[in-house]
Curated annotation (Swiss-Prot):
The modification Phosphohistidine is found at H221. The keyword Transmembrane helix applies. This is Sensor histidine kinase RegB. Keywords: ATP-binding, Cell inner membrane, Cell membrane, Kinase, Membrane, Nucleotide-binding, Phosphoprotein, Transferase, Transmembrane, Transmembrane helix, Two-component regulatory system. The gene is regB. The keyword Ribonucleoprotein does not apply. GO terms for molecular function: ATP binding; phosphorelay sensor kinase activity. One of its GO terms (cellular component) is plasma membrane. It is an enzyme of class 2 (transferase). Residues 218-445 form the Histidine kinase domain. It comes from the Bacteria. It comes from Cereibacter sphaeroides (strain ATCC 17023 / DSM 158 / JCM 6121 / CCUG 31486 / LMG 2827 / NBRC 12203 / NCIMB 8253 / ATH 2.4.1.).
Length: 462
């Protein structure tokens, strides 16, 4: 994986994603189509084509494919320049065929869109612009310079200049439109893939930390007896070596280090104990656990938990799922980062849903992008404002995307809004005047069912 400043994957390496085998297969399809069109046109329609030159043009593609197949490995990844050269060869070969077969009077001139579309989907913008400009240039050349199509009666096929110009204009517009549209779709797919990869990495990290805690707890339990034995033996040696100060000091040092190991394992075991009972907790405890890393960052974090109409007075006991904690933590981090002084975390529950609202007293979300919050790589703040509040933060919206994806995976619905009009004056704004995030779960997706089994039975070996 190649890291870069523009995201998870450096955009400059996109050409490395194109496989040579993919372009070879596409070229074989083009060769088959060209041969079929040439044979049908000459034999069935009776159009007189320069068959030798046409087969020579198609043969050039066949030779290039055979060389690429036998010389290079099938899993060869192409650089940006190599992919450009291959597509440029295909574009030139197709233009030569159009030159031989009537230019724009040949309806297959539409196929000149294919190399540009492939470039827009797989390569960089600069490469696509170059290839598109060359395609328009070659198309214009074949419009003026081409061999006429000779029909069976010996006459040449001609079309009105207005029709030929309209066909040329349609293909040029198609090159521009399909290039831009395909480019936009490719960027959206790549951004979403990168953000989903980052989400999966964050969730995997959280899961590994949880698993590591269980391993540490087990290690602390298993090492308890050996450490107790070491401490007992070292204490007895220290008493017996009272007349040999040097050896006695060594025995006491061993005992002290055994005590130190015991204390370390005990603290780690408490932090990472993977008891099934600890996989569930009251709603308030889960919210405090999610907010814990950001409570001491100079902003006041207030919790308010209450039942709504029809809700039980007791807090619901919910699952401590890693994606829920990590997602809420990202939302709380964003609120703390941009709050002036206070962040409010409200928990509300009824008989069929659980709602959590995170509100701050900052400036709120920019109105221009509030409908796009949660999309990957959306810049939410100006660079200078973001840097003053969050040093080293580039504001790409990836944190909110990760939070949104993780929480939606757990069955939640998220909504983003501003608590007050961002254009109000400071003295006119209410206390809760910043951004609002509301997360709502159906009860059955989050609440622990009473009397339900905690997990699979563990085989007890004797």
């Amino acid at each position: 994986m190649i890291l870069g400043p523009d995201g998870i994957l450096n955009r400059d390496t996109r050409g490395d994603w194109v496989r040579l085998r993919t372009l070879i297969l596409l070229r074989w399809m083009a060769v088959a189509g060209q041969l079929a069109a040439i044979v049908v046109t000459d034999w069935y329609l009776g159009v007189r084509l320069p068959m030798g030159l046409c087969f020579m043009a198609v043969g050039a593609s066949v030779i290039a494919n055979v060389i690429a197949t036998f010389v290079f490995p099938q899993n060869r990844r192409l650089t940006e320049f190599q992919a450009l050269m291959i597509l440029l060869f295909d574009l030139t070969q197709l233009s030569f065929l159009l030159f031989l077969t009537g230019g724009l009077t040949n309806p297959f001139a539409l196929l000149i869109l294919a190399p540009v579309t492939i470039s827009a989907l797989a390569l960089e913008l600069r490469t696509t612009v170059i290839l598109g400009a060359i395609a328009i240039g070659l198309l214009t050349f074949t419009a003026y310079f081409h061999l006429p199509l000779i029909l069976a009666d010996g006459s040449s096929l001609s079309v009105p200049r207005m029709f030929e110009f309209g066909f040329w204009l349609a293909i040029v517009i198609g090159i521009l439109f399909l290039g831009l549209y395909s480019r936009r779709v490719a960027i959206e797919i790549r951004s979403m893939s990168d953000a989903l990869l980052a989400t999966q990495m964050a969730l995997d990290r959280e899961q590994k930390l949880t698993d590591l805690g269980g391993v540490v707890a087990a290690a602390a339990h298993e090492l308890g007896t050996p450490l107790a034995t070491i401490k007992l033996v070292s204490s007895e040696l220290a008493e017996e070596l009272s007349e040999q100060p040097a050896l006695r000091d060594d025995a006491e040092l061993i005992r002290e280090q055994a005590d130190r190991c015991r204390d370390i394992l005990r603290s780690m075991g408490r932090a990472g104990k993977d008891d099934l009972q600890m996989r569930q907790a009251p709603l308030g405890e889960v919210l405090r656990e999610a907010a814990e890393p950001h409570v001491g960052r100079g902003k006041r974090v207030e919790f308010d938990l209450y039942p709504s109409r029809g809700g039980d007075e007791r807090q619901p006991v919910i699952l401590r799922r890693p994606e829920v904690i990590h997602g809420l933590r990202n939302l709380i981090q964003n609120a703390v980062d941009f709050a002036r002084s206070t962040v409010w975390i409200d928990g509300e529950w009824t008989g069929d849903r659980i709602a959590i609202r995170i509100v701050d007293d900052g400036e709120g979300y920019p109105p221009a992008i509030i409908g796009r919050i949660g999309d990957p790589f959306v810049r939410q703040r100006r660079a200078e404002e973001s840097q003053s509040r969050r040093p080293g933060y580039e504001g790409m919206g990836l944190g909110l995307f990760i939070a949104k994806t993780l929480l939606e995976r757990s069955g939640a619905e998220l909504s983003f809004a501003n608590a007050a009009d961002p254009f109000l004056r400071s003295h006119e704004r209410p206390e809760r005047c910043g951004a609002i995030v509301e997360v709502i779960w159906p009860v059955d997706r989050l609440v622990v069912v009473r009397n339900a089994p905690l997990g699979e039975n563990v085989l007890i070996q004797t």
